[in-house]
């Protein structure tokens, strides 16, 4: 019994416990406005904690940061644009990462039939895997939302 408990304790110590919130994720601006048919840029500001990095898209063997908007009939989502990533050497491999605060841009187009005076609420999920110089943590997700006033 003691041996089994010892192995269980060692297994817990050997694998990192999930630490939620390895990066601060904020929708910016939380409130936006545009006319029906207008293109609007929504932003996600991400600040990794010190010593933490998240992977940029294009690293085949790693989980990159992504933004996924919930389907919304009054909005068409465009392709997310990413800032230039840092190139880091991790485990003798050069990979694109974000280590400092950065901003993702999520373009949207309001439907031409959107009613002036209405508000469109958009919800999305930012998913990423945070790592430090020794280990990668389980993937994390953060919920973001914006209110878009139709002019």
Where do the PLM segments sit?
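Extracellular/lumen-exposed scaffold segments
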Residues: 12-151
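Sec-dependent N-terminal signal peptides
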Residues: 3-12
């Amino acid at each position: 019994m003691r041996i089994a408990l010892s192995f269980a304790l060692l297994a817990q110590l050997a694998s990192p416990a999930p630490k939620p919130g390895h990066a601060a994720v904020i929708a910016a601006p939380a409130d936006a406005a545009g006319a029906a048919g207008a293109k609007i840029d929504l932003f996600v500001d991400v600040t990794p904690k010190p010593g933490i990095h998240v992977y940029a898209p294009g690293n085949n063997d790693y989980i990159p940061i992504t933004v996924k908007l919930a389907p919304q009939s009054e909005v068409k989502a465009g392709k997310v644009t990413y800032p230039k990533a840092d190139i880091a050497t991790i485990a003798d491999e050069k990979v694109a990462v974000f280590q400092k605060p950065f901003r993702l841009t999520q373009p949207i187009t309001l439907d031409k039939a959107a009613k002036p005076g209405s508000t469109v609420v958009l919800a999305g999920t930012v998913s990423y895997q945070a790592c430090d110089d020794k280990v990668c943590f389980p993937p994390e997700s953060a919920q973001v939302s914006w209110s878009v006033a139709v002019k």
